[in-house]
């Protein structure tokens, strides 16, 4: 599933092609995505100028004066800006045509993505109750320490809770905990403020670097220009169970934590 760096890579790739453009029309070939596409998307979006394209957590918002189209890539979704006469491929579910003859095409083989509508001045229910962005100043060791008090869940589960912090999925949680030297099994409420500061710093560093590398291509993610993400080539623990730890050489451990595959070094991470 695309995580924060992949979604941010998508946003940055789309922004120069969408900002300031006016929507000419919307074609919905399949409306039965993870949630049905509401009729407001096709009824209200045509004629509107795209003022901005923003990211909140793993959602992309195409802002107009009357509201925002809210997009989620799901497990396998992709967004591409293409010439208006580009032939259809399998799973091309939505076209948003623009005033310059080009179009924004949403392709989603597994149909776990979504396209929703948020009226101006409102916050869509899916965006309510979300934690801070991990790259914002509000996300630091003090914040994590305060939020973790009384929490008995493993720290990896805690870190992946979208109400705690958004956009830190399985890949980047594993890599951040490794860099911070914290076992993913450690009880969240028993980690010191100092160790949480190391973890917050690791999350910021790893996510920031992954964005510069275009995200991680494991199965389905391709950026808007068709390029894969290259951070996969630099993963230190994720997907490497049984292989030597890059720090100490001991075999990396594997377990299921919170129903997610987890890999770590039991020697370097305590």
UniProtKB/Swiss-Prot annotation:
Residues annotated as catalytic: 2-3, 58, 260
Quaternary organization: Monomer.
EC number annotated for this UniProt entry: 3.2.2.23, 4.2.99.18
A Pfam family assignment: zf-FPG_IleRS
Family: Belongs to the FPG family.
GO molecular function: 8-oxo-7,8-dihydroguanine DNA N-glycosylase activity; class I DNA-(apurinic or apyrimidinic site) endonuclease activity; damaged DNA binding; zinc ion binding
Matching PROSITE patterns: FPG_CAT (PS51068), ZF_FPG_1 (PS01242), ZF_FPG_2 (PS51066)
InterPro entries attached to this UniProt entry: DNA_glyclase/AP_lyase_DNA-bd, DNA_glyclase_Znf_dom_DNA_BS, Formamido-pyr_DNA_Glyclase, FPG_cat, MutM-like_N-ter, Ribosomal_uS13-like_H2TH, Znf_DNA_glyclase/AP_lyase, Znf_FPG/IleRS
Keywords noted in UniProt: DNA damage, DNA repair, DNA-binding, Glycosidase, Hydrolase, Lyase, Metal-binding, Multifunctional enzyme, Zinc, Zinc-finger
HAMAP family, per the entry: Fapy_DNA_glycosyl
Protein name: Formamidopyrimidine-DNA glycosylase
Zinc fingers classed as FPG-type: ranges: 236-270
Organism: Stenotrophomonas maltophilia (strain K279a)
Binding-site positions, DNA: 91, 110, 151
A GO biological-process term: base-excision repair
């Amino acid at each position: 599933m695309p995580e924060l760096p992949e979604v941010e890579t998508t946003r940055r790739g789309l922004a120069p092609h969408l900002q300031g453009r006016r929507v000419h029309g919307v074609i919905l070939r399949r409306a039965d995505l993870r949630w049905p596409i509401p009729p407001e998307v096709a009824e209200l979006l045509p004629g509107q100028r795209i003022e901005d394209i923003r990211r909140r957590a793993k959602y992309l918002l195409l802002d107009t004066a009357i509201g925002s189209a809210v997009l989620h890539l799901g497990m396998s979704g992709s967004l591409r800006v293409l010439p208006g006469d580009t032939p259809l491929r399998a799973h091309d579910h939505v076209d948003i045509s623009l005033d310059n003859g080009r179009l924004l095409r949403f392709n989603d083989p597994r149909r776990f993505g979504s396209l929703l509508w948020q009226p101006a001045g409102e916050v869509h229910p899916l965006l309510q109750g979300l934690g801070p962005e991990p790259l914002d100043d509000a996300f630091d060791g003090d914040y994590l320490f305060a939020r973790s008090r009384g929490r008995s869940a493993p720290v990896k589960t805690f870190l992946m809770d979208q109400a705690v912090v958004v956009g830190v999925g399985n890949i980047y949680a594993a890599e951040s905990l490794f860099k911070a030297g914290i076992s993913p099994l450690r009880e969240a409420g028993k980690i010191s403020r100092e160790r949480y500061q190391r973890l917050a710093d690791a999350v910021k560093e790893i996510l920031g670097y992954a964005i510069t590398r275009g995200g991680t291509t494991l199965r389905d993610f391709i950026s808007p220009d068709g390029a894969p993400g290259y951070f996969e080539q630099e993963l230190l623990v994720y997907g490497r169970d049984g292989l030597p730890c890059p720090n100490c050489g001991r075999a990396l451990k594997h377990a299921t934590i919170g129903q997610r595959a987890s890999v770590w070094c039991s020697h370097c991470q305590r």
